Regions:
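Extracellular glycan-targeting catalytic surfaces
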Residues: 1-164
């Protein structure tokens, strides 16, 4: 699938100079993943991200991409370990990765900065290496199972965003 023709890419690059704030916002949003270590699960262990909340005060846990096994509530300051928090953390990692890959591709299309394309490609290659062996999981009949996510819809978003 060709998302943009050569002429469309050329026009996009020409027009992107008119919107430096937008390009900078995309760079800021991808900064942690662009400059950080590539974190991709070796097995399909992602769970529902709705579990990533404090069971005591219902506040979303503070996400730290470098802490897959310790999850802290910003309100009551409790730290949670184990399931369902660890696998929900992986679901969030997968989501943040595919969103960053898409944004990095847009940055590259708009600016020609090859480093963004290179990082996006590296992340996608990491997934390509492990995704075929991700276990299909989830047994809610009306949702369908997932691999990189908790359900079929998560899976569709994951793959669609990479394909774009």
């Amino acid at each position: 699938m060709i998302q943009f023709t050569v002429d469309e890419r050329k026009r996009l690059r020409e027009r992107s100079s008119l919107y430096p704030d937008t390009i900078q916002r995309l760079k800021n949003e991808t900064d942690e993943i662009f400059h950080g270590e590539i974190i991709v699960p070796k097995s399909g262990i992602a769970n529902w991200t709705l579990y990533y909340y404090c069971p005591d005060c219902s506040v979303k846990l503070k996400f730290d991409r470098t802490s897959p096994h310790r999850h802290r509530c910003p309100s009551c300051k409790k730290t949670f370990t184990g399931e369902p928090y660890d696998s929900s953390w992986w679901g969030l990692i997968n989501m943040k990765n595919y969103e960053a890959v898409f944004s990095m591709a847009v940055i590259w299309l708009a600016t020609g900065e090859q480093a963004y394309a290179d990082k996006a490609i590296k992340i996608m290659k990491e997934y390509a290496a492990f995704y075929p062996d991700y276990e299909v999981h989830g047994d809610i009949p009306y949702n369908g199972p997932g691999r990189a996510g908790a359900q079929t819809l998560d899976e569709a978003n994951f793959q669609r965003t990479f394909a774009m």
